[in-house]
Structure formats: structure tokens, C-alpha cells
């Protein structure tokens, strides 16, 4: 049987394009603005408050300018500010002029207030503020107008400038300090609720004050004249420079906030806001009245930024009695599990364990700098994703910041240079005049209460019990009936559940999703299918769930959540689960445990589509009443009482049930009183679990999925497959455990792609976008979820449920329906990439002859069949709902721009050589170069032979230069115009970067955004290994994030790096469409990118988890229109060229993309089809039958494609574009880009599910009909004047480059000198390639080097630095030497201090680095060939290494060698704790037994001493026999038989493969 929806009446323009039930377009913090920054503090313990410290804070702020951003006017800053102590000496002048006595110390409260500019509104605001202050029994002393110089502001900042005044208040005797701050906090909260428009209180305290504004950092002190006044003194300062993805100045969003300066992004914000809103109804703390606590609410607000909300949560804890340090520990906890260092501090683990059951972490990259005036401190997130460097002087002066070297302190006075490691804190107790280090801080907080005892007594843990093996149903037919009724299809069982049970991992697939969106499909879909997973890109990074799993957890807690504000033993009364998937045995244990459990059925009597809404209302009412009656756990179950669902019964979809109950309990103020468990038949894939947890479920029992596993294992066919060896033999318990393991691994991946470590933080966070759900439904059950195009009502959902129900009743077929959602099948779901489409295209491109003089009729006929096939398709994509709306008469084709002009806008997708065969990859490149278009190298480097222009092609189209290709012409080149820089940095060398016209930073991939990649060893041939600087057969891992891009300012730095090495190449950034991409793109434009590429969710892939292909990302139509709109609104559209890709197949697609704002167009899968791909959909198996996507030699020989076929395809596309332009009456694509007024909603479309779609978000773009100036882009953006320009301008340097001679030069550096040496490297590589330069240039530097010092260094270059360096030293280093030593006057021991930052030697393809000191996190991450000696490192050292040699002469952090598949590393372990810090998944740790290994180690240390004079190195060499036994050697499997690791192996000459 095949079930289809009945077609509804055709849509009309009005019913689709407009809808009174307006869709929700997203929270402001998601779609309007994200931010990042540079942040830090300065404190002086011993001295009195002075003005010098304030001056130094302003200077430090100025040194962070490159971490900030500016508005479209390039002058108005995104925000800068300082927090200091109250400047009493300055304010004394105000009191003196008024003959007022100045209140003592902490009896004076000062509010820094942004008031309306309009005088009458200002008076109203002042009066209300004074009224509220007096109600708090405080005395208003007066208002002080803050002196400012508005002339220094940018145009936009000036237009939005508030009137700035300070209100001065005092309190009665006995009310000072903390009590005064409490009253000011209450007053400010009350004031803020009424005066929200054009009004903001920056700070209101008796201890701290905040000066901030929408200015550049160097302007802050010029604007606020107070800050330059010698009477402005302080003993501490917190400073912050903001980079916003928006350009509309908003003064209140500058930082610091009231307590906090935040660098990073909270990924879990919506969940944190929802849970904090739930807590507001139950706030209770001794010493506070209920009325006072209610006055504080709402504490958080969806309209505010992540930093603002985190500050608000932090302030609640601080003002109710916690120190800022303890509050930060609660809200942003460290990863205390799997932390060897905490074994000596069990109380700290107990503290975090206790609060893990009360407070979900605010998760995401974060350097927090905070102060309440008594304490000033800083803390880092659990993953250490922001830099934090500090130094301490001998007279207890401490400077901490995002970069080293921002304050110029005498080197002789510095006693310590350090960094915060992941989860660590440092603080200054200003009252006690003490510097507090990490464990001292945490012990102090953890020992206040017996948290460990409370947990031991109160908490119950549900162990992972064995699964029930007894089947629920007696016969297979009943199972099929239940599966059908609950929405299973044959593919769900065979391609999802069975692989999970048999293999213990999620199924992998390829080629992307080419089926209709759920709301557009004529097939029934589950409610889950309307939700698209969001993911991290640019503003925060994804994380690696495999290699960095030690910081992740799926643990969940059941029961009532206790009072966050007052620790009590009973708050630990919870049940802890290892993961949210509970089996039947575990569910029963929960029901019989210590907490009150109640079941609520989600079944209802089937009585038409309206019966679901009635059942839902009843469910919500029952849930509320049950919780009010004392239930602590609510089990929402769709298990029928009679064991099976009957013909007259249906069920509320579990996602709808849990979302509705979750939100209605929040609204009723009951959510924290009970946890929700979902006991359901309709949950089997990882996406289903993620949705349920994301909308409020704490645990899920997928009873029908578990039953499906049992039935599969018991099936005779399964047993026979195991008997004959076609399936691995496993028993039933193993199959059930495999299923659980697969779900858990999939959940880790879904969390990690958003950059979230803990499921507790994902819980209720709603990190999805709904596509196709109506506003009423969303508000009812999924409030706060973006749903831009509207869609289904509750009745429509009921209709889908009934369709599935109709498959099972009254009579079930003999097998489950196969709708072909994954694999194409005749009669199944429509697939854009079908065999029919492929065949017609193959015929067209084969028949077309360039210059055919009118003889191409047959070719055009075939192309017309191809075009019609796609034109007449069922509605599949959002663009299919639109049609052209010409506003002028058609013109003749001769008047339209040429094919040759149009094809220059075309690009191929970034498909790697590794995913594609060499033949297919080079064929695409040659074709695009013939067209004057652009091919993309993808990840993996490129053979230098491809940079040649062919001049040896014979009459048969063959060339000895590229003998494996056919159909060649003289003048061809296989050089990819676009060179991709992906997270693995494989083959990214100076020569590679210099050979590109564009350099593409791949932030995400359409088919698997937020995920990394892995090229299996079997695909790494000798040729691939040569290109990627690896060894054949070694698995090559591309991390999920770029490890030098954790935020928008990090991306700006990489863009800067690429512009630095190749100033003639454009830099593009590839993003994937998701809600909020517009504001991300605005940040990318401000980060100085030249091109932004928006990929749709339907992009192709060589291999990806099936759940990612189907459920991650959004359509490019939503992405392109959002980006175009935001860039236009922010006056940034002229800065970047916009490119669209994802499922483009015809000229009609190109014109649609152009009308929506795209200027260039990417083609991936379809270009492969044009060269011969037959859509076999086996890319992920390495068995492509036509040699397109395989590395197997025998299969590659089957490749028959020639460049001409691809050329022909793009000519067809361009001709179609021309005909459509003529039809619209326009002469060029430039004339129609961004012109959505030329689009209208189709009136002839018939959708089967809803008439409630609204396409306003696609059609309502800024009117650009007249103003087209934004299409005029600067060819390549500049970095402006840089130190390298001065170096290159030196005649001696020019002489050395041009004549390969020797030159030595000396320069001073500061931290704003970034990417030093790289432009010199590019100039050499352009002339000589990677290895051809035989001269030698030595550059000596002194000072604090900015980021990316020595990036892409080349052979023949030596950089020697006295001082210190920030992050990314030696990034992409290809050769030469980098030497870094402390300043000559430094008095500290180098081996105990930090000298270089995070992520150094990232992706190095050669060279040597010697650093006389310690490095930060992720040293030598993805190192390919580089060698280095350092004297200590942070976490994740040598992560993903594939080659090279690393020596560490000091302590390291945890997770050493994670994902390390090649190379060797040596670690000096004087403490004996290295084994517990190693990630043992791949590498083996062994002592050095091979003589070649000892020789290698000693020679590198010897070289280190020669270059740096290292005292530690000298001591080791002087006592070699004593030290040798303390070294460990980390050896991956690929190196176990190398002579350095294995003394039994003789040294043989290594084979070197060169390009062929």
C-alpha cells in the first residue's frame, strides 16, 4: 500500500504569503547580535588607589583594539568600557563645589546612568529613579553630569548617544557596604522594569562603577573626560573591548556589565533562560522578603544578550550572599570528572557534583572577568576556549588579559608569567591584599558545607541495568502493526535501528538530502522531522565528542530541583542517571525508588483531527494537577493499557507532549518541582532523543525501539546471516547495549556540534529551528523556537498521526511501508538526484559540441528533458513555492549578457581529493579554468604539477604531464582557483596559499555542519599521503572546529593571516544556513572577509551520519535572504560578495538565488554528475562504480569523464540564465541581484499538509531597485599598514629574496604586531615555492609578539624573539626556525613560566620551533611535519598529530595525544603523572628503548639549548643518564615499527614520493 495525503485546494497568493498568525523569527540575541571581545583586569594589592593604574587599563584596552569591531562608519566602536572602584577623590570635587559632606567609604552609592537625550523624558526618568531610591530608604544626594567629549564619537555612535549622568545616594547608619549594594540592586531592578526605553543603568553600587560606550578602545578615555582626570584613582580595573556582529550602536551592550566582562558565547542560553525563569517562582533566601525577591524578577530576559543574562544570574547569586568566585563556579563549572589534578581535592568535586543536580551549566567559550569591588577575578570555561594570560610582579601588581604584553611592565620586576587552564580561576582579594590561585579559591568555596555527605545520604544513582530480553509482543505481525502506527518505515528499521544494534554506531550515508522538506512532502512525516538542529559556526566552536569526550557527560538528574540560593542537604535528594536512555528495568527501578513518581497517559480516543488538541489540553491540566499533588517525576507514556495500540486509539506525539507539559509547567511556576520522563514507542533515532531532551525530557524509555531490536535479533533471517558470517555474531544483550551505545554516541555528536559539553546544559535549551510549524503550535509547546515560515497547526499534526495510524489499522500489510526517504525508489519520496535526471544530463553534456554552429539540437533536447524533469518536480524546496513577477517587458536574447560573462560567477563545491578520485578532481578544475570560473580544491592540499599550464597535449587530448586524464587541450591547467583552508590544514603550505585566487575558510559543510571529518587509512594512498604530508594508510582526522577559530575575533585573525601571506587573494568564508546566520555573516564582513558563501542543508557529502544529513542545517533560501537582509540593514553589503550553494541544478535555480541576493553560485553534486557520477550513493564505502568518489586504482580506471562535459553543463546553465533574464526584461544578473520584488508566491501549487505557510522572510528584503551601489565591491580587502611591509621594504631583505643571499635585521614588537614574518614568507613562496629559496633571512625581535607570530614560515627564514608571544605561533609553518626566549632582564625561571600561547604549530608542514618556556593549550595540534622543543604545555598537546616530532621538557595538561595518528612525542615526567594524562585511544606510552629514539631526543634538546640557552635543557644534557629514564615516548600505531620507537627495526632510507 502507498499512502498519500489528499491534495488540498491550490494556494493563493494571499493565503501563503501573508498570515495573521505571524511566525516567530528568533530571539534578538540569536538573530540580531552576537559578540566577542578582548577582556582583562589590572589590580594593585599593596598600593593605594592611583591614577596610573587607570591609565594602564586604558592602554591595555587600546592594545585590544584588533579584537574589537566597528560600525559601518568604520569609526563608531562596537563597545569599550572599564569598571573600577568608586573614584572618591574625583567625586570629592563635586561634593566640595556643593558644600555637601561626602559620605564615608561604603555609605556612598553611585549610579552610572544612560538617560534619554530629550529633556522632558530625562526629567521623567530622573523623577522615577529618585522615587524608587527613596522607597528603598536611601537619600538622593544629587545628580552629576558626566563630562564627555562627543566630538570624538563616530557618526552612528553620536546619533545614538545617551545623556550620561551619575546619581549619588547615601544610606542611614548601619546600612553600608553589602546592605547598601543590596538595596541599590533592588532599586535598579525595579527601575529597569519601567524605564526600558532610552534608559539604562550601567552600574549602581557603593564599590564599583562602569564607564562604557559604543566607542573604540582608544577613544574611551578621550570621550569620558573623568578617565583622564588625575583625581580618578582606583586599585583595580576591569577592561573590555567588544566585537559585535551587528553595526547598529547600542550603548548598553558595551561591557563590562554590572559585575562581569565576558569574552565568548553561551551556547545554551535559551535553556538557561527557561530554567532561570522557572526558578523565579521559587526564589527563597534568608534575610530577603518575598516582595524583595519578586522585585528582582524577571532576572533574565530573552531579549537580552548572553553576556547580559549571565551577568544577571551571577549578580543574583552575589547579591544574595555568594562571592563572585563561588557564583562563577556554580554557573560555569569546570570539567571536574576525569580530572587527575582533583584527586587531591575531593571537596571541590563534591561541590560541583552537588550543584550539577541544581543548576545546569551556562556552557560555551568564556573568559569571565568579574568584580564586586571586594574581589576581582577571572575564570575560564571548562574547555579553555578563550585565551587568558597573566603576569605578577614582585610588588603584587597583577595583569590578566586575553593577550600577553598589553601592559608594559619592567621585565626585571615580573616574578610569574602564567595562563589560565581550562576551568581555572585566579583572583585578587582587595581587602585582604592577597592573590588567590585556582585550588585555593575552590577549596574555600567547597569547604563551606559538607556537600559530599549530603550526596552520599540523599542521592540515588540508577545503575545501567541489563536489558529485559523478554519480548513485549507475541508475534512479529503485532510488532509491525505497532511500528506502523507509531510512524516507523522500513528504512527506519533497516537503515537506522538495525545498524545501531548490530554495529554499535550511527548509520553513515552520503550525497546529502535531496528530498522535500517535511512540510512540503506529500508523504507523512514525524513531528521530529520539522525540527532542524542548530550548530556552532564562527561565534563559537563545535567540539570533538570522540577525542575530547573527557569533558562531556550525558548524566541527567531526576526529581525536584532544590533552592539554588541556599545550600541544603535535601537539595541533593535526586536520582542520577548515567544517560537519558533508560530501559524497562531501569524505568521500573525509578518508579520504585525514593521519589514520588506518577504516570500520565498520552493516549486518546481517536475522533477526527480535533481530538488531538482536546487530548493535549487534558494532558497539560492533568500534568499540572499531578505535580501540584506532589509528584516529583512525571512519566508521560503512550504504552496502551492492553499492551497494544488499538484501532480506536491514538497518541499525542511524544515531542508535542513533552514540549507542551514542559512549557505549561514553567508558566504555572511548577517546572522545578518535577522531572519529565518520556516512555514512548515513537523514539528511535538520535535526533528523536535530542529533540525530546531539548524540549524538556530528562529521560526516555524507547520501548518499541528496544522491542524492534529484540525482534530483529530473534528473526530467523538475522540468525542465518550471523551463521554464514555476513553479520558479526552477537547475543541479544549485546545488541541492546549496542543500540544504547549508538544513541549515546549520537547524542554526544549532536551536543558537540553546538559546542555543548553536558546534556544537562542541552536539556530544555531548544537548540533547533522549526521549519513548517505554525506560530500557535510553536507557542503552545515549543515557545521560543524560531519558526520563520509558519506551517502546521495542531490539527494538521493530528492529520499526520492519523495517516500513520491508517497504515496499521484496520488491517496491517505484511511489511512496513518504504517511503524512500533515504534511498531513491520508484513510487517513493521524490529525490532531486534521481537516475532519470542523471541519464538525461549525461546525454546532454555528451552530445553538446562547443562552437557547434547550430548543430546542438539533440543536446539541447536532452538538456530540456533534464530541465523539465526538475521544473515539473513536486514542491521540494522553498524556492519551488515562488515564481517570477516581471515588472517590465521581455527583451531579446541578444541584449542579454553573454554566456562567457555568466559562467564566471560559477564555482564548484569544496570536494576534497580524497573524497573524489584524482581524475574526477582534476577534471573539474580544468573545466572551470576553461570557463574562467572557479573550482575549489577542497581539503587536502594540491599537487604542484597542477599549477602548470599544459603545452604538451596531443591530437587525442592526452598529455604526459597528466597522463591519467583525457579530453585535454593545450592551455589547460588543473590549478584550483579557490584554495580551501579547512580544520585539518592538510597540505596548507605557503606555496599552496600563494597559488590561489581565493582562499576559502570552510567553517561548516552543508551535509554535516558542526562536525569534523575523517579520511580512513584505506583511502590514504601514497599520493594522498604526499599531498597531505602524512604516511600512506594512516587515518587523517579533520577536527570539528578550526582550532584557531573559537570566536568571531579569532576568525578575523585567520582572515588577517591569509590576507597577510597573499594580499592579492580574496578570502572567502563558507557558512551553512541556520537561524542567526545573518548576524554571523555581519560579523564575518566586519572581520574583513571578501566573500561569504552560504551553503544549504542539502549539500552533498562523501560520508556523514545519516541523522546529520537529514536533520542539521536549513535551506539556503532562508540563509541567503537572511544574510542579504542583515548586511543591507547594517550597511555592510558592499563589503562582501555573497555566494550561494546547495542543490543548485539549473539556470532557474541560479536566477532564484540571484533574486534573493546571491552574486555567485556554487555547484557540487551536479558537477560530479556532469562528469559521470551516476548517484550510486556509495561514496562512503570507497566503492564508487564509475571512479568518481574512490581511491581504489581499479575503480578509478573506470572514470570516463572529460573536462568538456563539465564545460558543456555550465554552458547549458548559463544559456538558461540568459533566457530567464530576457523573459524578465533585464540584461544582466547584476540588474536582478537582491530584487525579490521580481518574485511572487505561486498560485498553482498544491500542498497536502498546510495552507499556512508565509514566505515573507524570503520576499521582504530591503528595496534595492534604485540603489545598486552595494554591488561595487573592493577587489581584495587590505590589512592596512603592517610591520612586514617595513621588513619587505628594506633593501637588504629585497636583495636577499631576489638573489638568495643572507640578511639579518632587528625590530621591536608589541602585541598589536600580528602575523609577523608571514608576508615575507608569501613573497618568497611566490618566487621560489616551498623549497626553492636558498638564501637565509634572520629577523631578531624584542617585545611581546601578537598572534600568529611566524605563521607559514618558510625554509631560509629564522625568527628569533626575546620576550613572549601570543596564540598561534608557527601556525602552518613549513620550514625555517622560530626561536623564542625570555627577555634578557627576566628574573624568573623560564621552565616554570608561559612564553607562548594556545594552538601553536597548528597544521605545521615543516620547520623547527624552540621555546624557552611553556606553551598553552593544544600545542602542535594537527602537526604534520614540524619539530619542536618546549618546556611545558596545556591540555590536548599533540592532538590530531600525523607526523613530526615534539619534545616537552616539563608538565603537560590532560588528553595528551588524542587523535594522534602519526609522528612521535617525548615528554619529561618528573612527577610521574603523565600516564593518567594520556588519551590511550590510539597512542601507546613507552620508555625510550631504541637507540635511534634516544639519539633523536638528545639531538633535539641539544639544538634547543644551542638556540635558546635553556637552563632546563642544559641540566638535562648534563645529567643525561638520570633524566633519560624520566622521559616517555608517545607512539601511534603508524610509528610502532619506526627505528626511533622500536629498537629491533633497522633504519632504512625513507621513500619520498614527488608529484607525478
From Swiss-Prot:
One of its GO terms (molecular function) is metal ion binding. Binds 1 [3Fe-4S] cluster. Its cofactor is [3Fe-4S] cluster; FAD; FMN. This is Ferredoxin-dependent glutamate synthase 2. It catalyses: 2 oxidized [2Fe-2S]-[ferredoxin] + 2 L-glutamate = L-glutamine + 2 reduced [2Fe-2S]-[ferredoxin] + 2-oxoglutarate + 2 H(+). Belongs to the glutamate synthase family. Pathway: Amino-acid biosynthesis; L-glutamate biosynthesis via GLT pathway; L-glutamate from 2-oxoglutarate and L-glutamine (ferredoxin route): step 1/1; Energy metabolism; nitrogen metabolism. Residues 37-431 form the Glutamine amidotransferase type-2 domain. Residues 1533-1556 are annotated as: Disordered. Keywords: 3Fe-4S, Amino-acid biosynthesis, FAD, Flavoprotein, FMN, Glutamate biosynthesis, Glutamine amidotransferase, Iron, Iron-sulfur, Metal-binding, Oxidoreductase. GO terms for biological process: ammonia assimilation cycle; glutamate biosynthetic process; L-glutamate biosynthetic process. It comes from Synechocystis sp. (strain ATCC 27184 / PCC 6803 / Kazusa). Its EC number is 1.4.7.1. It comes from the Bacteria. The keyword Transferase does not apply. [3Fe-4S] cluster binds at residues 1173, 1179, 1184. InterPro entries: Aldolase_TIM (IPR013785), ET-N_metabolism_enzyme (IPR050711), GATase_2_dom (IPR017932), Glu_synth_asu_C (IPR002489), Glu_synth_asu_C_sf (IPR036485), Glu_synth_centr_N (IPR006982), Glu_synthdom (IPR002932), Ntn_hydrolases_N (IPR029055). CDD domains: gltB_C (cd00982), GltS (cd00713), GltS_FMN (cd02808). The keyword Protein transport does not apply. Pfam families: GATase_2, Glu_syn_central, Glu_synthase, GXGXG. The active site is at 37 (for gatase activity). NCBIfam families: PRK11750.1.
Amino acid at each position: 500500500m502507498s499512502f498519500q495525503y489528499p491534495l488540498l485546494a491550490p494556494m493563493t497568493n494571499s493565503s501563503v504569503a501573508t498570515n495573521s498568525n505571524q511566525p516567530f523569527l528568533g530571539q534578538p540575541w540569536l538573530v540580531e547580535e552576537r559578540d566577542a571581545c578582548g577582556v582583562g583586569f589590572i589590580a594593585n594589592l599593596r598600593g593605594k588607589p592611583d591614577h596610573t593604574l587607570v591609565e594602564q587599563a586604558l592602554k591595555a584596552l587600546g592594545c585590544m583594539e584588533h579584537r574589537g569591531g566597528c560600525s559601518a562608519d568604520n569609526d563608531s566602536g562596537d563597545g569599550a568600557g572599564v569598571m573600577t572602584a568608586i573614584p572618591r577623590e574625583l567625586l570629592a570635587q563635586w561634593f566640595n563645589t556643593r558644600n555637601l559632606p561626602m559620605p564615608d567609604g561604603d555609605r556612598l552609592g553611585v549610579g552610572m546612568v544612560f538617560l534619554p537625550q530629550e529633556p522632558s523624558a530625562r526629567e521623567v526618568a530622573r523623577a522615577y529613579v529618585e522615587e524608587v531610591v527613596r522607597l528603598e530608604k536611601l537619600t538622593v544626594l544629587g545628580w552629576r553630569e558626566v563630562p564627555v567629549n562627543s566630538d570624538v564619537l563616530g557618526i552612528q555612535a553620536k546619533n545614538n548617544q545617551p545623556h550620561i549622568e551619575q546619581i549619588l545616594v547615601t544610606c542611614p547608619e548601619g546600612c553600608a557596604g553589602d546592605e547598601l549594594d543590596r538595596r541599590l540592586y533592588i532599586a535598579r531592578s525595579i527601575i529597569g522594569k519601567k524605564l526600558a526605553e532610552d534608559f539604562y543603568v550601567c552600574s549602581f553600587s557603593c564599590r564599583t562603577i562602569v564607564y562604557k560606550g559604543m566607542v573604540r578602545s582608544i577613544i574611551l578615555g578621550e570621550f569620558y573626560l573623568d578617565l583622564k582626570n588625575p583625581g580618578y584613582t582606583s586599585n583595580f580595573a576591569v577592561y573590555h573591548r567588544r566585537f559585535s556582529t551587528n553595526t547598529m550602536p547600542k550603548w548598553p551592550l558595551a561591557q563590562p556589565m554590572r559585575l562581569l566582562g565576558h569574552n565568548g558565547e553561551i551556547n545554551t542560553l535559551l535553556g538557561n533562560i527557561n530554567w532561570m525563569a522557572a526558578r523565579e517562582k521559587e526564589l527563597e533566601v534568608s534575610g530577603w522578603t518575598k516582595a524583595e525577591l519578586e522585585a528582582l524578577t524577571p532576572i533574565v530576559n530573552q531579549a537580552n544578550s548572553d553576556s547580559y543574562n549571565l551577568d544577571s544570574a551571577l549578580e543574583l547569586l552575589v547579591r544574595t550572599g555568594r562571592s563572585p568566585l563561588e557564583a562563577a563556579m556554580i554557573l560555569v563549572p569546570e570539567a571536574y570528572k576525569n580530572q587527575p589534578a582533583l584527586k587531591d581535592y575531593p571537596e571541590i568535586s563534591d561541590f560541583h557534583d552537588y550543584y550539577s543536580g541544581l543548576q545546569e551549566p551556562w556552557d560555551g567559550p568564556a573568559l569571565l572577568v568579574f568584580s564586586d569591588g571586594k574581589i576581582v577575578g577571572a575564570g575560564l570555561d571548562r574547555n579553555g576556549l578563550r585565551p587568558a594570560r597573566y603576569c605578577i610582579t614582585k610588588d603584587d601588581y597583577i595583569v590578566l588579559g586575553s593577550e600577553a604584553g598589553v601592559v608594559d611592565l619592567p621585565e626585571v620586576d615580573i616574578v610569574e608569567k602564567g595562563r589560565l587552564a581550562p576551568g581555572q580561576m585566579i583572583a585578587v582579594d582587595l581587602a585582604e591584599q592577597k592573590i588567590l590561585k585556582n585550588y585555593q579559591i575552590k577549596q574555600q568555596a567547597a569547604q563551606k558545607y559538607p556537600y559530599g555527605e549530603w550526596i552520599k545520604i540523599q542521592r540515588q544513582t540508577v545503575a545501567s541495568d541489563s536489558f529485559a530480553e523478554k519480548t513485549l509482543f507475541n508475534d512479529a505481525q503485532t510488532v509491525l502493526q505497532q511500528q506502523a502506527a507509531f510512524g516507523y518505515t522500513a528504512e527506519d528499521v533497516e537503515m537506522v535501528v538495525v545498524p545501531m544494534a548490530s554495529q554499535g554506531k550511527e548509520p553513515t550515508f552520503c550525497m546529502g538530502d535531496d528530498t522535500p522538506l517535511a512540510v512540503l512532502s506529500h508523504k507523512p512525516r514525524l513531528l521530529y522531522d520539522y525540527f532542524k538542529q542548530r550548530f556552532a559556526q564562527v561565534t563559537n566552536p563545535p567540539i570533538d565528542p570522540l577525542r575530547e569526550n573527557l569533558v562531556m557527560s550525558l548524566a541527567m538528574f531526576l526529581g525536584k530541583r532544590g533552592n539554588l540560593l541556599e545550600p541544603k542537604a535535601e537539595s541533593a535528594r535526586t536520582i542520577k542517571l548515567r544517560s537519558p536512555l533508560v530501559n524497562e528495568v531501569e524505568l521500573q527501578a525509578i518508579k520504585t525508588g525514593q521519589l514520588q513518581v506518577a504516570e500520565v497517559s498520552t493516549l486518546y480516543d481517536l475522533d477526527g483531527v480535533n481530538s488531538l488538541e482536546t487530548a493535549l489540553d487534558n494532558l497539560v491540566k492533568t500534568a499540572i494537577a499531578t505535580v501540584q499533588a506532589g509528584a516529583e517525576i512525571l512519566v508521560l507514556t503512550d504504552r496502551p493499557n492492553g499492551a497494544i495500540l488499538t484501532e480506536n486509539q491514538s497518541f499525542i506525539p511524544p515531542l508535542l507532549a513533552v514540549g507542551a507539559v514542559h512549557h505549561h509547567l514553567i508558566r504555572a511556576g511548577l517546572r522545578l518541582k518535577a522531572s519529565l520522563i518520556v516512555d514512548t514507542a515513537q523514539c528511535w533515532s538520535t535526533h528523536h532523543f535530542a529533540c525530546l531532551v531539548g524540549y524538556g525530557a530528562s529521560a526516555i524509555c524507547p520501548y518499541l525501539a528496544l522491542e524492534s531490536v529484540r525482534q530483529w535479533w530473534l528473526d530467523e533471517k538475522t540468525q542465518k546471516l550471523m551463521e554464514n558470517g555476513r553479520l558479526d555474531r552477537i547475543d541479544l544483550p549485546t545488541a541492546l547495549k549496542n543500540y544504547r551505545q549508538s544513541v549515546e554516541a549520537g547524542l554526544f555528536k549532536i551536543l558537540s556540534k553546538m559546542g555543548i559539553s553536558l546534556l544537562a546544559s542541552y536539556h530544555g535549551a531548544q537548540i533547533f529551528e522549526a521549519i513548517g510549524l505554525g506560530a500557535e503550535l510553536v507557542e503552545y509547546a515549543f515557545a521560543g523556537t524560531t519558526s520563520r515560515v509558519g506551517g502546521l497547526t495542531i490539527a494538521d499534526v493530528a492529520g499526520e498521526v492519523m495517516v500513520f495510524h491508517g497504515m496499521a489499522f484496520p488491517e496491517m500489510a505484511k511489511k512496513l511501508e518504504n517511503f524512500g526517504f533515504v534511498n531513491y525508489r520508484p513510487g517513493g519520496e521524490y529525490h532531486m538526484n534521481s537516475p532519470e535526471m542523471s541519464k538525461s544530463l549525461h546525454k546532454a553534456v555528451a552530445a553538446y559540441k562547443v562552437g557547434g554552429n547550430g548543430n546542438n539540437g539533440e543536446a539541447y533536447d536532452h538538456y530540456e528533458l533534464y530541465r523539465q524533469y526538475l521544473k515539473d518536480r513536486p514542491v521540494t524546496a522553498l524556492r519551488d513555492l515562488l515564481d517570477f513577477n516581471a515588472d517590465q517587458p521581455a527583451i531579446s536574447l541578444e541584449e542579454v549578457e553573454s554566456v562567457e560573462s555568466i559562467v564566471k560567477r560559477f564555482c564548484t563545491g569544496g570536494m576534497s581529493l580524497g573524497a573524489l578520485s584524482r581524475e574526477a578532481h582534476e577534471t573539474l578544475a580544468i573545466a572551470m579554468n576553461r570557463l574562467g570560473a572557479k573550482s575549489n580544491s577542497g581539503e587536502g592540499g594540491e599537487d604542484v604539477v597542477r599549477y602548470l599550464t599544459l603545452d604538451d597535449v596531443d591530437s587525442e587530448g592526452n598529455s604526459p604531464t597528466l597522463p591519467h586524464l583525457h579530453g585535454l587541450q593545450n592551455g589547460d591547467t588543473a590549478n584550483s582557483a579557490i584554495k580551501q583552508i579547512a580544520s585539518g590544514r592538510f597540505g596548507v603550505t605557503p606555496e599552496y596559499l600563494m597559488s590561489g585566487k581565493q582562499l576559502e575558510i570552510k567553517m561548516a559543510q552543508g551535509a554535516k555542519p558542526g562536525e569534523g571529518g575523517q579520511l580512513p587509512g584505506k583511502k590514504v594512498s601514497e599520493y594522498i599521503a604526499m599531498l597531505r604530508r602524512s604516511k600512506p594508510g594512516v587515518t587523517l582526522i579533520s577536527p570539528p572546529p578550526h582550532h584557531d577559530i573559537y570566536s568571531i575575533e579569532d576568525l578575523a585573525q585567520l582572515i588577517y593571516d591569509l590576507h597577510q601571506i597573499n594580499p592579492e587573494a580574496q578570502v572567502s568564508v563558507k557558512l551553512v544556513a541556520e537561524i542567526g546566520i545573518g548576524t554571523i555573516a555581519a560579523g564575518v564582513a566586519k572581520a574583513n572577509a571578501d566573500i561569504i558563501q552560504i551553503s544549504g542543508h542539502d549539500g552533498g557529502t562523501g560520508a556523514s551520519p545519516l541523522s546529520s544529513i537529514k536533520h542539521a542545517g536549513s535551506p539556503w533560501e532562508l540563509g541567503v535572504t537572511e544574510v542579504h537582509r542583515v548586511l543591507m540593514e547594517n550597511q555592510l553589503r558592499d563589503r562582501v560578495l555573497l555566494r550561494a550553494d546547495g542543490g543548485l541544478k539549473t539556470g532557474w535555480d541560479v536566477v532564484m538565488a540571484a533574486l534573493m541576493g546571491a552574486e555567485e553560485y556554487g555547484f557540487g553534486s551536479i558537477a560530479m554528475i556532469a562528469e559521470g557520477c551516476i548517484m550510486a550513493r556509495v561514496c562512503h564505502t570507497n566503492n564508487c562504480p564509475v571512479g568518481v568518489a574512490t581511491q581504489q586504482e581499479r575503480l578509478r580506471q573506470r572514470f570516463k569523464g572529460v573536462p568538456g562535459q563539465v564545460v558543456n553543463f555550465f554552458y547549458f546553465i548559463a544559456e538558461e540564465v540568459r533566457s530567464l533574464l530576457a523573459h524578465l526584461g533585464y540584461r544582466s544578473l547584476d540588474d536582478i541581484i537582491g530584487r525579490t520584488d521580481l518574485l511572487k508566491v505561486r498560485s498553482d501549487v498544491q500542498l497536502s499538509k498546510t495552507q499556512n505557510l508565509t514566505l515573507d522572510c524570503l520576499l521582504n528584503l530591503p528595496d534595492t531597485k534604485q540603489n545598486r551601489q552595494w554591488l561595487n565591491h573592493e577587489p581584495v580587502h587590505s590589512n592596512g599598514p603592517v610591520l612586514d611591509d617595513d621588513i619587505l621594504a628594506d633593501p637588504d631583505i629585497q636583495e636577499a629574496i631576489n638573489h638568495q643571499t643572507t640578511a639579518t635585521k632587528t625590530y621591536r614588537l608589541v602585541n598589536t604586531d600580528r602575523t609577523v614574518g608571514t608576508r615575507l614568507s608569501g613573497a618568497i613562496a611566490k618566487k621560489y615555492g616551498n623549497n626553492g629559496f636558498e638564501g637565509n633571512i634572520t629577523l631578531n625581535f624584542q617585545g611581546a609578539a601578537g598572534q600568529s607570530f611566524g605563521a607559514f614560515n618558510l625554509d631560509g627564514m629564522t625568527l628569533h624573539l626575546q620576550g613572549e608571544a601570543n596564540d598561534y605561533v608557527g601556525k602552518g609553518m613549513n620550514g625555517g626556525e622560530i626561536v623564542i626566549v625570555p627577555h634578557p632582564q627576566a628574573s624568573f625561571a623560564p621552565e616554570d613560566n608561559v612564553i607562548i600561547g594556545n594552538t601553536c604549530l597548528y597544521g605545521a608542514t615543516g620547520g623547527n620551533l624552540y621555546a624557552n618556556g611553556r606553551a598553552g593549550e593544544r600545542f602542535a595540534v594537527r602537526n604534520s611535519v614540524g619539530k619542536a622543543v618546549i618546556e611545558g604545555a596545556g591540555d590536548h598537546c599533540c592532538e590530531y598529530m600525523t607526523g613530526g616530532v615534539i619534545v616537552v621538557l616539563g608538565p603537560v595538561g590532560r588528553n595528551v595525544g588524542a587523535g594522534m595518528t602519526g609522528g612521535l612525542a617525548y615528554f619529561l615526567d618528573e612527577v610521574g603523572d603523565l600516564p593518567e594524562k594520556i588519551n590511550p585511544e590510539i597512542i601507546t606510552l613507552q620508555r625510550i628503548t631504541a637507540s635511534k629514539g634516544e639519539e633523536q631526543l638528545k639531538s633535539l634538546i641539544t639544538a634547543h639549548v644551542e638556540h635558546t640557552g635553556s637552563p632546563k635543557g642544559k641540566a638535562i644534557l648534563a645529567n643525561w643518564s638520570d633524566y633519560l629514564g624520566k622521559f616517555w615516548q608517545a607512539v601511534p600505531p603508524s610509528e610502532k615499527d619506526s627505528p626511533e620507537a622500536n629498537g629491533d627495526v633497522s633504519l632504512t632510507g625513507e621513500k619520498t614520493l614527488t608529484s607525478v
